[in-house]
Amino acid sequence: MRNIALTLKYLGIAYHGWLVQKTVTTVGQTLEEAAAAVVGHPVHMTGCGRTDAGVHARVYVANFRTTARIPCDRLPYALNTHLPEDIVVTNAMEVHDDFNAIGSCVRKEYTYLIYNSGIRDPFYVNRAWFYPKHLDETVMQRAADCFVGTHDFAAVRSVGTDVKSTVRTVYYYKIEREGDLISLRVCANGFLYNMARAMAGTCVYAAEGKFPPEDVAQILLNGDRTAAGPTVPPGGLYMTKLWYDDGKAVFHVG
């Protein structure tokens, strides 16, 4: 049985996230159906992370097992003939048997886009969060700096989610403006549910003056979700980089 890793990208507007669900269309389900049509048997896709409804991926990795002998260099073309235009497979490679798209991933980068202008741009609808009040990206960066390091991130996760530990390590959080578009790039060894979006909302709250940006450090220490900023809309969030190192497969995409 071959273990195949796919690299893909998708626009998440039409999908209810990655995870396969019975009553709604998801990216994972759509990819599984396309792969089954190509290899001639049902497949199970393991994705590199749970992206929510409306979230996009400039890069995404999934793996599946197959008995089909189709060469990896032909797989992207074959899969794309069965996929809608908003999901594209860009690469396929055979990996070792223990490779797992989520378990072998050691770092991820998400980018959140804010369209910060007094007039909305229709080309950014569901692709960036329209925010008409001017934001000072230097204040946002001061708040973002407080997230860097190893912390308990319970204050920026969705309440009611159950995980073994809420401690994560953030390697960098960079906020940049280019014209009216503000990008927030954050890299960590893992993300809690809605963590990236809540971190973005907290940086926005700091720029609004709801609390000094340096207070974010204390908000993390207190672990109070209500003290942090809101969970911003999903349409501005993109998975943008992935790092893999499980001792056998070492690579990064994005």
Language-model features, listed with the residues they occupy:
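Structured-RNA-binding interfaces characteristic of tRNA pseudouridine synthases
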Residues: 1-254
